[in-house]
UniProtKB/Swiss-Prot annotation:
One of its GO terms (biological process) is negative regulation of DNA-templated transcription. GO terms for molecular function: DNA-binding transcription activator activity; DNA-binding transcription repressor activity; transcription cis-regulatory region binding; zinc ion binding. Keywords: Cytoplasm, DNA-binding, Iron, Metal-binding, Repressor, Transcription, Transcription regulation, Zinc. This is Ferric uptake regulation protein. The gene is fur. Residues 1-84 are annotated as: DNA-binding. InterPro entries: FUR (IPR002481), Fur_C (IPR043135), WH-like_DNA-bd_sf (IPR036388), WH_DNA-bd_sf (IPR036390). Residues 85-143 are annotated as: Dimerization. Disulfide bonds: none annotated. It comes from Vibrio cholerae serotype O1 (strain ATCC 39541 / Classical Ogawa 395 / O395). The keyword Cell membrane does not apply. It is found in: Cytoplasm. Homodimer. Signal peptide: none annotated. Fur acts as a repressor, employing Fe(2+) as a cofactor to bind the operator of the iron transport operon.
Length: 150
């Protein structure tokens, strides 16, 4: 049995072709932080005949089962990523919509200190930073605009 079949069964979901295909697409590195509409278009490009309503339904089931995490970034559109990843925070460009994942030990430690200061046992957290492209908004045409500076 494949890992994806087992993952669906472990989540209490029946193994169906649409669920397997959607899970396969979500596992592609370039398909993190993907909307339902973008996922649907990707499936069409792969010649998969899965309707948009099915994509929405499966993503909601995956979210409920903990297979994916739903994010509501600025702009109101939900995007999804697999939940199996390590903890990370997000930096979102408001000009082009690029979502950059990052981890920073100093930020993580500071969040723990703040929680302790207010006598709160931190069980979970998420950090979203929003900003505009520092290179005059031309990031829409520049694929390297958001690469880390050295």
């Amino acid at each position: 049995m494949s890992d994806n079949n087992q993952a669906l069964k472990d989540a209490g979901l029946k193994v169906t072709l649409p669920r397997l295909k959607i899970l396969e697409v979500l596992q592609q590195p370039e398909c993190q932080h993907i909307s339902a509409e973008e996922l649907y278009k990707k499936l069409i490009d792969l010649s998969e005949e899965i309707g948009l309503a099915t994509v929405y339904r499966v993503l909601n089931q995956f979210d409920d089962a903990g297979i994916v995490t739903r994010h509501h970034f600025e702009g109101g559109k939900s995007v999804f990523e697999l939940s199996t990843q390590h903890h990370h925070d997000h930096l979102v460009c408001l000009d082009c919509g690029e979502v950059i994942e990052f981890s920073d030990d100093v930020i993580e430690q500071r969040q723990k200190e703040i929680a302790a200061k207010y006598n709160v046992q931190l069980t979970n957290h998420s950090l979203y930073l929003y900003g505009k492209c520092g290179s005059d908004g031309s990031c829409k045409d520049n694929p390297n605009a958001h690469k880390p500076k050295k």
